[in-house]
Curated annotation (Swiss-Prot):
Top-rank lineage group of the source organism: Eukaryota
Lineage of the organism: Eukaryota, Viridiplantae, Streptophyta, Embryophyta, Tracheophyta
Matches recorded under PANTHER family: HVA22-LIKE PROTEIN F (PTHR12300:SF99), HVA22-LIKE PROTEINS (PTHR12300)
Membrane-spanning intervals of the chain: 2-22, 41-61, 63-83
Name of the gene: HVA22F
GO cellular component, one term: membrane
Membrane topology annotation: Multi-pass membrane protein
Family of the protein in this entry: Belongs to the DP1 family.
One matching Pfam family: TB2_DP1_HVA22
Main location (coarse class): membrane
Locations listed in the record: Membrane
Keyword field: Membrane, Transmembrane, Transmembrane helix
Protein name per UniProt: HVA22-like protein f
Length: 158
């Protein structure tokens, strides 16, 4: 019985590193290799929030030492951020961060792209983005849309 109580008292220390570091590290590696940017947003946002929590803890550790529930609160919050069924970091990104950060703000320089066009450009690698931007500057966005439609039409044939 004493063993179970000891585990319950240190549950945060046993589970915390796996939830707060190991799984996010693994998922971040997978996100880097995936073609979509949605998981990149999830994990970049997670690491930013986790860093802010760590800075907060380091700044006020003397106060937090007096709060016995702090490690459990932190664990629950990080579980909410990490677990795929909640995707809390993605929620924070889409509902709070995105309001203050313009999507594709570094895309297109002074060119007036629509939000949809910026999203398309943002999903590309830097080299591809530069090539498409040069093409758009020379021929206009309509020619890019025509090329995309032609490629989609060609894909349907096969």
């Amino acid at each position: 019985m004493g063993f179970i109580i000891a585990i319950a008292k240190r549950f945060d220390a046993l589970v915390g590193p796996g939830v707060m570091l190991l799984y996010p590290l693994y998922a971040s590696f997978r996100a880097i290799e995936s073609p979509t940017m949605l998981d990149d947003q999830q994990w970049l946002t997670y690491w930013i929030i986790y860093s802010l929590i760590t800075i907060f803890e380091l700044s006020v550790w003397r106060v937090l030492a007096w709060l016995p529930f702090w490690p459990y609160l932190k664990l629950l919050f990080c579980m909410w951020l990490v677990l795929p069924m909640f995707s809390g970091a993605a929620y924070i990104y889409s509902n709070f961060v995105r309001q203050y950060v313009k999507i594709g703000m570094n895309v297109g320089g002074g060119t007036n792209y629509t939000d949809e066009q910026r999203r398309v450009l943002q999903m590309m690698s830097l080299d591809a983005r530069k090539s498409v931007q040069d093409y758009v500057d020379r021929f206009g966005w309509d020619s890019v849309e025509k090329a995309i439609k032609a490629a989609e039409k060609e894909t349907r044939k096969h």
